[in-house]
UniProtKB/Swiss-Prot annotation:
This is 4-nitrophenol 4-monooxygenase/4-nitrocatechol 2-monooxygenase, oxygenase component. Substrate binds at residues 100-104, 205-206. Keywords: Aromatic hydrocarbons catabolism, FAD, Flavoprotein, Monooxygenase, NAD, Oxidoreductase. Disruption phenotype: Cells lacking this gene completely lose the ability to grow on 4-NP, 4-NCA, and hydroxyquinol. It comes from Rhodococcus opacus. Belongs to the FADH(2)-utilizing monooxygenase family. The gene is npcA.
Length: 528
């Protein structure tokens, strides 16, 4: 395990990082980026703190103590241990304001190290070369876990023309432009990654789209300081010069999302995981992100808990907590939180062991839990804001409270039920920045789209479960109706169709003409 200082030193490697059009010389010191870099340095240091050793670390098979972000669960107890680990970080980072610490990104490799063979078996390599991609993945895993490398996955491609399947070949997405005995050369864009300026290596891949070509199918690990690689990040929402009382979240930092441009970047074969087969991109990446979504579900439960806590503190401070209507609304928030947590526990309780020996929480309950969160989070946040009333907008600043004339008067006017004015306003300011600012809007958009949008979560649920007409969920209904199994239903339908007039003459012009004549729609002309 490395220290926070070692982590910061690893970021001073000549990387090309642009934030809001500005080239950042040193992400560890620049005001737009230093806050988050320091937060992740603290992340690494806390792993070395003996007080948190049992929660944040484990001892591997060789007797080496490592960070839990490399821990491969092999039992239900291991899955619960990982949940406790993720919960620690989401609580530490203010209820999940940083959505992609290293703990949330390294899991992308879990599915690969669990079952590396298909990544090589499915590959298509030019020139008759034989590359052992499975061995590459094993070596990469050994290296990144030993060196405690910070990774960020980049699988999303640029939004070009999504109205045509054949438009994908025209996109400037990342593609292979050359294969040789040493490796591959790639050119183009990867469209989305989180915490890009603050990691050591990118794990690039694809989420399949219609029309994807062989050259566009690339999975590899790429160091961030590789020549020709540029990171283009969105404008930072960090406010390093503000007072933490006024901006309790953005003063901590901004994890930053960005794009990556590869200008004829060389990737040696040992860093490549798979190339050449678009069909591979249809299924295996989803298995990778199943592990990410487990972490996402845990974050959702922690965030829901924060909303409940803020609501209880707020309504108590306002003196509205005993109002029957408010109590009913608070009960809705509590139910939201408990349901989110219940899905996480259900996923663990009904998990299964993979072919590679990992214990994987049931992805169906993970997806159902994510859908429940996305369907209800807006109502929960809106309810919290309604509890605030005008206070969430009319909140004095620290300078107002510190003013010799205004301060005492504000303290008197804004005091609450057994709470000082400053503390009461701090609740409003937390809610305001978290949900009503550009900083908060980015967080909302991340949760809405990072783990696939809601409609796709629902679609995946239907594709990956027995929720089908011939599945076990229709057993009781068929029994009640006396239908028997689906084969019996189909046999009866075929028998009826075979003996029916409408089936035997379907689409026959003679039959259709007879009906028209019979019903007076058509009059036969007499032959002369």
């Amino acid at each position: 395990m490395r220290t926070g200082q070692q982590y910061l030193e690893s970021l001073r490697d000549g990387r090309q990082v642009y934030v809001g059009g500005e080239l950042i010389d040193d992400v560890t010191t620049h005001p737009k980026t230093s806050g988050y870099a320091k937060a992740i340095a603290e992340y690494y240091d806390l792993h070395l703190d003996p007080e948190h050793q049992d929660v944040l670390t484990f001892v591997d098979d060789d007797g080496v103590r490592k960070s839990m972000h490399w821990f491969l669960p092999r039992s239900k107890a291991d899955a619960a241990r990982r949940r406790a680990y993720h919960e620690f970080w989401f609580r530490h980072f203010q209820g999940g304001i940083f959505t992609r610490p290293p703990a949330g990104m390294h899991v992308v490799m879990y599915a690969q190290i669990d079952d590396p063979e298909p990544w090589g078996d499915n590959a298509v390599v030019a020139g008759g070369r034989t590359i052992s991609f499975a061995d590459n993945i094993r070596s990469q895993w050994q290296r990144v876990t030993t060196d405690d490398v910070a990774l960020s996955p980049m699988f999303v491609d640029v939004q070009f023309d999504r109205g045509r399947d054949d438009a994908l070949v025209e996109t400037p997405m990342l593609s292979i432009v050359e294969q040789n005995d040493q490796g591959i050369v790639v050119r183009g864009w990867k469209a989305m990654g989180t915490s890009l300026p603050f990691v050591n290596e990118l794990l690039v891949g694809n989420l399949w789209r219609p029309g994807q070509t062989s050259d566009q199918t690339v999975y590899a690990i790429v160091p961030v300081n590789t020549p020709g690689l540029s990171l283009v990040c969105r404008q930072s929402n960090a406010t390093p010069d503000a007072d933490p009382y006024d901006h309790p979240l953005s003063t901590i930092g901004d994890e930053l999302d960005g794009m990556a441009y590869f200008d004829d970047v060389f990737i040696p074969w040992e860093n490549v995981q798979h190339i050449g087969n678009p069909d591979h991109a249809k299924w295996y990446p989803q298995r990778q992100f199943d592990w990410v979504h487990i972490e996402t579900q845990i974050r959702h439960a922690v965030h829901a808990e924060l909303i409940v806590g803020l609501a209880l503190l707020l309504t108590n401070a306002l003196g509205t907590n005993n109002n029957p209507i408010v109590q009913s609304q608070l009960a809705d928030l509590v139910r939201f939180r408990e349901t989110c947590k219940a899905f996480a526990i259900a996923a663990e309780e009904t998990g299964f062991t993979t072919a590679g020996g990992l214990f994987k929480p049931n992805n169906i309950y993970v997806d159902l839990g994510r859908a429940h969160y996305l369907e209800n989070i807006h109502n929960a946040v809106n309810q919290l804001i309604e509890f605030c009333g005008r206070g969430v907008v009319m909140s004095p600043t620290k300078a107002d409270f510190d003013h010799p004339f205004l301060g005492p008067k504000l303290e008197e006017a804004l005091r609450g039920t057994s709470i000082s004015a400053r503390d009461r306003v701090s609740i409003f300011r937390q809610i305001s920045e978290r949900y009503l600012t550009q900083w908060g809007a980015r967080h909302e958009m991340f949760e809405k789209f990072n783990g696939t949008p809601l409609y796709l979560v629902r679609l995946l649920t239907m594709q990956r479960t027995e929720y089908q007409v011939d599945g076990p969920l229709t057993d009781l209904a068929r029994q009640v109706l006396g239908f028997g199994d689906t084969e019996a239903l189909a046999a009866r339908a075929a028998e009826v169709e075979k003996n029916s007039n409408w089936a035997s003459v379907a689409y026959q012009p003679e039959y259709a003409r007879e009906q028209d004549v019979r019903d007076g729609y058509y009059k036969e002309t007499e032959k002369v």
